[in-house]
Regions:
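Structured alpha/beta or helical-core interaction and ligand-binding surfaces enriched in interleaved
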Residues: 1-129, 133-200
Length: 200
């Protein structure tokens, strides 16, 4: 059965399937949670240096411990977009080794890893839906298929099973006593900075 992060709950998880589809401007993938870490690590190994990390962090008043989400693009949560720029591969792996556990488990935040040089980006969104972005996005079909994730014209992601009668739930969680907000404060010591506020 499709696995989800501990910070999210979806209705009818039995309906959700792994797979990917090509969309306008994005390669979208539904990745079961137990595979997501390996896919991210391999993406880091493939993209060109230098790299950057982007974090989308809900403002505290929007980060409830049980936030209902009805589907893609719904909700009225504002989030702070933050960046850690000009990372080498070694530096990005160090950041991910330290904070990847909370990035993956948390339900209320989103994150992306990308190349400054090529623009290739892996954006891990709410419910851990993955979008590969950039002109080279289609090359990552091979990465997905290596992990048993194949094209699907009728792909059902977590977003596709949500509605107002059956919302998903996104939660702020702790991993080893650390929340995403704690991780942000620690990453500021390494150069993480705020770039602006957007509405989710």
């Amino acid at each position: 059965m499709f696995q989800t992060a501990i910070g999210v709950t979806i209705p009818f998880p039995e309906k959700v399937r792994e797979g990917y589809r090509i969309m306008d401007g994005a390669l979208r993938a539904s990745v079961s949670f137990e595979k997501l870490d390996a896919v991210i690590r391999e993406f880091i190994s493939l993209i060109e240096e230098p790299m950057f990390l982007a974090l989308h962090i809900p403002l505290p008043e929007g980060a409830t411990e049980d936030m209902s989400v009805y589907g893609e693009g719904t909700g009225s949560v504002y989030e702070q977009v933050m960046y850690l720029d000009q990372c080498s591969r070694e530096q990005m792996l160090s950041v991910y080794n330290t904070f990847g556990g909370i990035f993956l488990a948390d339900g209320v935040s989103q994150f992306a890893i990308a190349s400054h040089k090529s623009g290739d980006e892996m954006f891990v969104q709410l419910f851990k839906i993955v979008d590969f972005l950039g002109e080279g996005r289609l090359r990552y079909t091979a990465l997905l298929e290596k992990h048993g994730i194949y094209p699907s014209d009728g792909l059902l992601t977590a977003w596709d099973v949500l509605d107002k009668e059956h919302p998903g739930k996104c939660r702020l969680v702790k991993v080893l006593g650390t929340t995403i907000f704690d991780a942000v404060e620690r990453l500021k010591e390494f150069g993480l900075y705020a770039a602006g506020v957007i509405e989710r």
